[in-house]
Amino acid sequence: MAVKIRLKRMGSKRSPFYRIVVADSRSPRDGRFIETVGTYNPVLSPAEVKINEELALKWLQNGAKPSDTVRNLFSSQGILEKFHNAKNSK
C-alpha cells in the first residue's frame, strides 16, 4: 500500500480549509484517510499552518511520500530539515 501525505479539502464554497492527512494513494482526494497530521488555512492573510511534527516525522520515516504542496508546507515549518538530519545521522 503506497501511502501519501496530502491535503483534504474542507470548508465551504470559495472558502477553502484543508486538513493535512495520511491516506492511501488510491483513495480519492476527500475520501478515506488513515490519520490527520495537521491543518492549513490559506484564506488568512499570513496562511495559518498547524502541523503535529511528531506524527509528520513518524509517517515520513515509515515511507509516506508528501505531495508537492505538503512538501512546501513541511519545508517552511522546518519538518523536512529535521527528517533529513535524522535520516543522515543514522
Swiss-Prot record:
GO-annotated molecular function: structural constituent of ribosome
Lineage top rank: taxon: Bacteria
Residue stretches in coiled coil: none
Biological processes, Gene Ontology terms: translation
Keyword Iron-sulfur: no
Membrane-crossing residue ranges in chain numbering: none
NCBIfam families: S16
Family designation: Belongs to the bacterial ribosomal protein bS16 family.
Name under which the protein is recorded: Small ribosomal subunit protein bS16
Lineage start: Bacteria, Bacillati, Bacillota, Bacilli, Bacillales
